[in-house]
């Protein structure tokens, strides 16, 4: 196991606190507990951190949300613009996002949309983006990675499936 946990940047969309249409976008970082061997402990800790942070963000004004988001994004954007992204330590190791899609089945000219597969982007100096999308009764995960840092995304996808099975077994046994 690694000495320090991987840290994920998690973007989220929140209802606008001012009641206007659209979303307020924010984000936070969360340790993924990859330095711990117990998968159940990992999930419990991640759930506690994400639940607590989302609750705090839901209570913020739109101005506070914007300032909070800017504080998190500013170092990333400045390092990208100045070209020093490889010199300063990263704020996080990967991005993990969840895209909310319709839960009812969609059709186009009578043909059913069977699945949605997510794709996302990478910033310079960051090696991996994992995006999860739920549609109807299915969940799909998309992996976008830097070839030099993550040479086999296919293996990562397979290992992720195996880890999810292990996690399910440990939680529901």
Enumerate the language-model features and the residues they cover.
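Flexible helix-coil linker/hinge segments at domain or subdomain boundaries
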Residues: 55, 162-173
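Helical lid/core segments from catalytic subdomains that handle acyl or acyl-like groups
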Residues: 20-102
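Short proline/glycine-enriched turn/loop segments at secondary-structure junctions
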Residues: 16-19, 82-87, 119-120, 131
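Low-complexity, glycine/alanine/valine/leucine- and proline-rich hydrophobic stretches
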Residues: 90-164
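Hydrophobic "lid/gating" helix adjacent to the active-site nucleophile
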Residues: 1-18
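Short beta-strand elements
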Residues: 14, 27-30, 130-134
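Short glycine/proline-enriched turns and hinge-like loops at secondary-structure junctions
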Residues: 3, 20-23, 107
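A generic structural motif
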Residues: 16, 31-36, 145-150
């Amino acid at each position: 196991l690694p000495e320090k946990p991987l840290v994920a940047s998690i973007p989220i969309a929140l209802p606008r606190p001012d009641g206007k249409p659209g979303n307020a976008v924010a984000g936070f970082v969360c340790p993924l507990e990859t330095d711990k061997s117990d998968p159940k402990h990992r999930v419990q800790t991640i759930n506690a951190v994400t639940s607590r942070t989302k609750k705090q963000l839901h209570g913020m004004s739109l101005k506070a949300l914007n300032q909070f988001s800017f504080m998190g994004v500013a170092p990333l954007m400045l390092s990208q613009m100045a070209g020093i992204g490889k010199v300063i330590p990263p704020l996080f190791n990967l991005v993990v996002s969840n895209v909310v899609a319709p839960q009812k089945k969609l059709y186009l000219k009578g043909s059913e949309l069977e699945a949605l597969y997510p794709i996302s982007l990478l910033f310079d100096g960051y090696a991996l983006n994992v995006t999860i999308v739920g549609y109807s009764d299915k969940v799909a995960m998309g992996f976008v990675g830097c070839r030099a840092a993550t040479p086999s995304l296919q293996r990562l996808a397979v290992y992720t499936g195996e880890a999810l099975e292990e996690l399910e077994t440990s939680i529901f046994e």
